[in-house]
Amino acid sequence: MSANALQPAEPWCPEAETSAWGFHNKWTWVRQPSRGRKNQQWTCHWRVLGPNNGPALVLLHGFGASSGHWRRIAPKLAAQGWQVFSLDLLGFGASDQPGLRQGGPLDNQIWGQQTAAFLEEIVQRPAVLVGNSLGVLSALTTAVLTPHLVRALVAAPLPDPALVQPMPRRHSPWRRSWQRRGLRFVVQLLPLQWIVPLIARSKLIRLGLQGAYTRSITNDLELQELIRRPARRPTAARALRAMTLGMSLRPRGATAPALLEQLATTRLPMLMLWGQNDRFIPLAVGRQVVNQHPWVELKVLNDCGHCPHDEDPNQFLNALMPWLDRNLGNSRPAGDVQQR
């Protein structure tokens, strides 16, 4: 990875906590064939900030967001000596937005494969994974696929309906096949090509975002544009259709309970940072996870909603950094350094 190949977004300065943070680049992910599927090539947007010799930390965004959503903590982590990477997951941000015909259903299995390939090809060393919401499911999947490349995992928070509503009992193959066809038919009927552009240009984006925050976001125009911009792309509707189908038809092994069971024996350090006032994924879900998996640690962040990294970055980092100290010891950076 050559620093000369990386381009900073404009306007940009190392200290600025804006959605344009970091040096930006494009990466072509070649997804390997499986079960009759041919090679697929997708262009993915990613960014980096911090010293080249610093330990690696990868930030994975939530649903509807992108790498820019880490605007308030990425510069602070880089100042502490981390080399901070962030990736726009397939279908989000400035990465490609394939539909069902181009790439099939999109789910955390694919995003986990994408992140694993990113670690192997771009980061090129084991890293700490920090995810927000959907990014956590991707991080969990990556840790199962490539445990040798994940040093620790931070979930802020951990979403999955399967955590509160058990998966239905497994039906016969013919019944599952008809269920899949029926769901695909319904999803194809949804006029998302009309709905998504309308929502992207309406106040609904701000109203939906406000549900994820305790503080008012009315005047945070940068945050609103961060969500609106990818939704205005002509390929956004087809990608949303692929995600809706993919996340609805995930196999049991791709759900959070199954992934946690697989990680339970690996001794992977895992921390959950949960907003006290999270209206999307209530704190009770986090407490339930800890009761079932005592090896997972939970820290509650006061007066925060679903996006604590953006709502209260100082409280977020004050909870994160001591935990990294305890679990990574001498292999994490010490103190402030000059950013790249």
What are these model-predicted stretches?
Residues 1-36:
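An N-terminal hydrophobic leader/cap segment in hydrolases
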Residues 294-340:
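Catalytic active-site module of serine/aspartate enzymes centered on a nucleophile-bearing elbow/loop
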Residues 44, 193-264:
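Conserved alpha/beta-hydrolase catalytic His-Asp/Glu region
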Residues 266, 272-274:
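Short beta-strand/loop motif that positions the catalytic acidic residue
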Residues 30-47, 79, 86-134, 172, ...:
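Active-site loop/oxyanion-hole signature of alpha/beta-hydrolase fold enzymes
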Residues 277-281:
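Acidic catalytic loop of the alpha/beta-hydrolase fold
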Residues 47-97:
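Conserved HGGG/HGGXW glycine-rich cap/lid loop of the alpha/beta-hydrolase fold
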Residues 124-170:
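Conserved hydrolase catalytic core segment
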